[in-house]
Design a protein with these regions (language model features):
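Short, hydrophobic-biased segments on the C-terminal half of alpha helices
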Residues: 41-42
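Key DNA-contact positions within bacterial/archaeal DNA-binding proteins
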Residues: 35
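Extreme N-terminal segment that seeds HTH/winged-HTH DNA-binding domains in transcriptional regulators
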Residues: 1-29
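Short, Lys/Arg-enriched C-terminal cap helix and immediately downstream tail that follows
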Residues: 48-49
Length: 49
């Protein structure tokens, strides 16, 4: 899965969740490391999420 698709999925998960979603959970669900999730969330925040 490329980064753009992964970040779109992260954005959808975060926006649809009523509670905070741990990075470890996102990493497991998307089959990437937690550090990749941290980097993706930083990019999403920089772009206004």
């Amino acid at each position: 899965m490329n980064g753009e698709i992964r970040r779109a999925k992260i954005e959808n998960i975060l926006k649809s969740s009523a509670v905070p979603v741990p990075g470890v959970t996102l990493a497991k669900d998307l089959d990437v490391s937690r550090q990749i999730i941290v980097s993706d969330i930083a990019l999403l925040r920089a772009n206004g999420l």
